[in-house]
């Protein structure tokens, strides 16, 4: 991991998904790339967002404090900022974007 490097990651979150897992990359209607992620937690009192942050931190092997929800707190489509990660780390963890 590279120190001082930040990556913006767009995620479409599915709460109550049965398990915590990434399901690959997709494009929205406007052609913007996002990562599909499901978590077992319900969308109640921030539980699904917390599970998403924990899942990303564990998968990318970074501290939870390095994952920040920048936008989309109550929406399914979220923008996160990942500190100390470069795009190659994301591609290794979740596969290359389509």
From Swiss-Prot:
- What Gene3D superfamilies has UniProt attached to this entry? YggU-like
Q: Which InterPro entries match?
A: DUF167 (IPR003746), YggU-like_sf (IPR036591)
Point out the signal peptide segment.
Answer: none
Which Pfam families did the record assign? DUF167 (PF02594)
Under SUPFAM superfamilies, the record lists: YggU-like (SSF69786)
**What family is this protein classified in?**
Belongs to the UPF0235 family.
> Any idea what this protein is called?
UPF0235 protein CCNA_03737
Could you tell me which species this protein originates from?
A: Caulobacter vibrioides (strain NA1000 / CB15N) (Caulobacter crescentus)
Q: Lineage, please?
A: Bacteria, Pseudomonadati, Pseudomonadota, Alphaproteobacteria, Caulobacterales
């Amino acid at each position: 991991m590279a120190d001082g490097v930040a990556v913006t990651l767009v995620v479409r979150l599915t709460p109550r998904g049965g398990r915590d897992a990434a399901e690959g990359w997709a494009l929205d209607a406007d052609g913007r790339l996002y990562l599909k992620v499901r978590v077992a937690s319900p969308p109640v009192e921030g539980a699904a967002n917390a599970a998403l942050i924990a899942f990303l931190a564990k998968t990318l092997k970074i501290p939870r404090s390095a994952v920040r929800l920048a936008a989309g707190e109550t929406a399914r489509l979220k923008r996160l900022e990942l500190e100390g990660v470069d795009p190659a780390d994301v591609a290794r963890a979740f596969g290359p974007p389509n």
